Amino acid sequence: QDKPFWSPPIYPV
């Protein structure tokens, strides 16, 4: 069972 891993792309401003 795959775990829903969602990482939003955060860029240093």
Curated annotation (Swiss-Prot):
Q: Which residues carry this modification: Pyrrolidone carboxylic acid?
A: Q1
Query: Looking at the record's lineage, which domain of life comes first?
Result: Eukaryota
Q: Name one GO cellular component term.
A: extracellular region
Transcription as a keyword of this entry, yes or no, is no
The compartments listed are: Secreted
Q: Which UniProt keywords apply?
A: Amphibian defense peptide, Pyrrolidone carboxylic acid, Secreted
Please name the Pfam families in this protein's record.
Answer: Tryp_FSAP
Which terms under GO biological process does the entry name?
Answer: defense response
Tell me yes or no: is Kinase among this UniProt entry's keywords.
no
On tissue specificity, the annotation reads:
Expressed by the skin glands.
Q: Which family does it belong to?
A: Belongs to the frog skin active peptide (FSAP) family. Tryptophillin subfamily.
Q: What protein name is recorded for this chain?
A: Tryptophyllin-T3-1
Q: Which organism is it from?
A: Phasmahyla jandaia
